[in-house]
């Protein structure tokens, strides 16, 4: 059978079109075999995915999966750290071995793969913990563009901290490899010369783990700015999600139009024609004194639809080449682009699907998954708090995914933004908080002074109780230790009566003897309160934290439907999502 991973991009596009049932799939495969098959088979040699290379880190304490390709049915021997494993490639040239589990090892060792006369050799390979750091631009954001980079980079000499950046891209079909070019697709030890290209969040996360655990840390940065959750979920899974059908249908329609229009030439003609038609309408409107009509053609809408940010595209191009790799866990920072327009609508289905899909791809149904809750951001048009902004939906979906999915963690980041930008420059606190979660929940690190697990959560809302004209808020045990308001400031609290109109509220921490602390919330404008919200806006303000200065999670005590902008749909909490 023809291996799709060996096909050139044009062939993959053809396969995508046929797979969408525009023509019979069997005919497509026969055509592709005729066009590309003989050449691909003739060129089959010993090779491995680019995730394997010089200076890489392999996952400790578990059998290590190694795979690649060789001549059909040729013998293959993999040797590393004093052990060798033999196998033979199958008829399609694919092979796979499992090395025995190894402890952490900070001294670089040679890694070799042999098949008859062919040899692949990788040098300076370490054994430690490997983390996949995915998402969109805030995870892609390089250390050199982060706050205090001028202080951090000169001291970033950590030979045991390694990272690899996977070039952003999309594909209509799953890929077996990613490109290695222009400094991307290759492992690098962290040093003042290289650290600036590491993801800022991933760097601070990995650096803290490396220093605390004293083992090598490998960071795989597979992030792409502007992506949505549906871009990181497989096509097969998306087809089972009702809210994703609009996106799939729109993509398939664009594929049909592209092919029917004659690919690039036809697309250019359609764009020119659409421009002429719109210009004619605009001239008529101006003569009448009206505004320009909507729908001005955008050349991007006439590009190859199988390129770029398409449903499942980044997953196919950036994650599928890693499928089956041994990982310690995942750190995922995504959601900003699902807070634009009506992109929040499928998020409740697609975001949890990222977790389940990635766990399936990496063959670990309990793979630790750290979720970074999106930061606050705003625009010049909306600098005040906005209860119905899409970001509130996104953060609540992220919170509910954490609460309903085992072995996940949620890291707060809304307070890391000091400039209202969608790209906060302060990556250090976000990386540190993520490291707290990993150390506590994944590695079981204890706080010796407290004789308790290392604290990683801020206060988590648990319940409310009305006391006359005030509401008392209780928090989950363990998250409320040292509960306090920064400088006794009540920023971020809002309270409403039965009219569902929220007002800025006053708040204070109260603590009866032998009872856990609570927050008392009130407003003279709301004599009969029924609901409280905290840090509930597009650019949240908040002052509530625990003794470790970990911020409280945004919360609301009500379940009232939200009406996010730009759409008529309501957002309501699904049964069982109350947290």
Where are these regions (language model features)?
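Short, solvent-exposed linear motifs at loop/edge-of-secondary-structure regions
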Residues: 1, 6, 26, 529-530
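N-terminal secretory signal peptides that target proteins for export/translocation
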Residues: 1-21
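Bacterial N-terminal signal peptides
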Residues: 25-34
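Sec/Tat signal peptide C-region and signal peptidase I cleavage site
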Residues: 38-42
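Cell-envelope and extracellular/periplasmic
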Residues: 43-579
């Amino acid at each position: 059978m023809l291996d799709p991973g060996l096909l050139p991009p044009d062939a993959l596009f053809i396969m995508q079109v046929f797979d969408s049932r525009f023509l019979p799939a069997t005919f497509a495969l026969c055509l592709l075999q005729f066009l590309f098959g003989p050449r691909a088979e003739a060129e089959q040699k010993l090779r491995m995915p680019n995730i394997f290379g010089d200076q890489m880190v392999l996952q400790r304490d578990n059998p290590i999966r190694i795979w690649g390709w060789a001549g059909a049915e040729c013998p293959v021997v993999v040797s590393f750290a004093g052990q060798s494993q033999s196998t033979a490639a199958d008829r399609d040239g694919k092979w796979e071995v499992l090395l025995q589990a190894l402890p952490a090892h900070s001294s670089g060792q040679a890694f070799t793969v042999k098949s008859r006369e062919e040899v692949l050799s990788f040098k300076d390979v370490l054994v430690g913990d490997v983390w996949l750091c995915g998402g969109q631009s805030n995870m892609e954001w390089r250390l050199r563009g982060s706050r205090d980079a001028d202080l951090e980079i000169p001291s970033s000499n950590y030979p045991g901290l390694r990272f690899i950046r996977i070039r952003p891209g999309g594909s209509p079909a799953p890929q077996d490899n990613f490109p290695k070019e222009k400094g991307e697709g290759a492992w690098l030890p962290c040093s003042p010369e290289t650290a600036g290209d590491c993801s800022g969040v991933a760097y601070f996360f990995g650096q803290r783990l490396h220093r605390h655990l004293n083992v090598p840390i490998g960071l795989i940065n597979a992030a792409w700015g502007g992506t949505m959750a549906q871009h990181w979920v497989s096509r097969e899974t998306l087809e089972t999600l009702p809210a994703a059908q609009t996106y799939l249908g729109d993509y398939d329609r664009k594929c049909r139009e592209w092919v029917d229009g004659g690919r690039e030439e036809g697309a250019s003609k359609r764009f020119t024609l659409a421009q002429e038609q719109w210009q004619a309408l605009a001239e008529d409107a101006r003569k009448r004194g009206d505004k320009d009509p909507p729908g001005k053609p955008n050349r991007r809408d006439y590009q190859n639809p199988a390129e770029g940010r398409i449903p499942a595209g980044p997953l196919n191009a950036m994650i599928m080449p890693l499928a089956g790799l041994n990982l310690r866990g995942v750190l995922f920072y995504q959601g900003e682009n699902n807070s634009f327009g009506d992109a929040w609508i499928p998020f409740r289905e697609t975001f949890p699907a990222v977790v389940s899909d990635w766990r399936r791809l990496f063959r670990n149904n309990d793979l630790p998954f750290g979720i970074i809750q999106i930061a606050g951001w705003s625009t010049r048009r909306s600098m005040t708090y906005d209860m119905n902004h899409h970001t509130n939906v996104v953060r609540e979906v992220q919170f509910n995914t954490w609460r309903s999915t085992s072995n996940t963690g949620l890291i707060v980041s809304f307070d890391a933004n000091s400039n209202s930008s969608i790209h906060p420059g302060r990556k250090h606190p976000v990386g540190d908080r993520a490291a707290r979660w990993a150390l506590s929940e994944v590695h079981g690190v204890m706080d010796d002074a407290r004789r308790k697990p290392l604290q990683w959560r801020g206060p988590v809302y648990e319940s409310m109780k009305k006391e006359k004209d005030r509401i008392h808020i209780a928090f989950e045990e363990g998250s409320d230790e040292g509960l306090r308001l920064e400088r006794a400031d009540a920023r971020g609290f809002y309270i409403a009566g039965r009219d569902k109109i929220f007002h800025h509220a006053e708040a204070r921490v109260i603590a009866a003897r032998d009872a856990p602390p609570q927050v008392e919330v009130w407003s003279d404008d709301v004599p009969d309160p029924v609901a409280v919200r905290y840090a509930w806006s597009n650019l949240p303000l908040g002052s509530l934290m625990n003794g470790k200065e970990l911020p409280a999670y945004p919360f609301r005590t009500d379940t009232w439907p939200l009406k996010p902008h730009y759409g008529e749909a309501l957002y309501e909490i699904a049964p069982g999502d109350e947290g």
